Amino acid sequence: MIIAIDGPAASGKGTLAKRLAAHYGFRHLDTGVIYRAVAKAMLDAGADLTDEARAAEVARTLDPSRFDDPALKSHAVGEAASVVSAHPQVRAALVEFQKTFAAAPPGAVLDGRDIGTVICPDAEVKIFVVASPEVRAHRRFLEAQSRGEPADEAVILSDIVKRDERDKNRSAAPLKQAPDAVLLDNSYLDIEGGVRAAIDIVEAVRAGRRRV
């Protein structure tokens, strides 16, 4: 079984994906980490983020061991990832990696922006997770504080709104809800409530009550 979870930045999709994977014994891939790794490599090299050819070359030679780098979680890397992920050549370079991961048994949970629409359009379960920009900004603010990083919630909110626009309007795999995805509004659910709601969606499919 493949579970595709999509949604905007800081919507809570990553946490839900990890918990679902643990619950069902499936493998988990946060596809955003892949793009963050490309972005950080570009930043570390002092490269122009708008240089599509350079970014695509980085993507093709990406070292998976970089995926665990705590620095990938920084706000700056996240903003840079939004830029490099808009490059069609970068996305093309990383599509096969994601599809291969999804196809491996016994099952997989992938979260990102285009899992249900591009990477795994035939996924048995598709969930589109949303939350208000204000709630998402506050979550990112708290995350930054927990890491001891300076943060301005108003700036984070502004960046999130801008990132949403970039993600929705990019030419390559724009952020959008798949027609057969279930919408899960995570604005005012705690972690356990969100996980229960997601499990209910998956169980409905497993029981054959609903084709998602």
Curated annotation (Swiss-Prot):
MF annotations from Gene Ontology: ATP binding; CMP kinase activity; dCMP kinase activity
Record-listed ATP binding positions: G7, P8, A9, A10, S11, G12, K13, G14, T15
Biological-process GO terms, alphabetical: pyrimidine nucleotide metabolic process
Annotated SUPFAM superfamilies: P-loop containing nucleoside triphosphate hydrolases
Gene that specifies this protein: cmk
UniProt keyword list: ATP-binding, Cytoplasm, Kinase, Nucleotide-binding, Transferase
Assigned GO CC terms: cytoplasm
Name this polypeptide is given: Cytidylate kinase
NCBIfam families registered for this protein in UniProt: cmk
Reactions that this protein is recorded to catalyse: CMP + ATP = CDP + ADP; dCMP + ATP = dCDP + ADP
EC number: 2.7.4.25
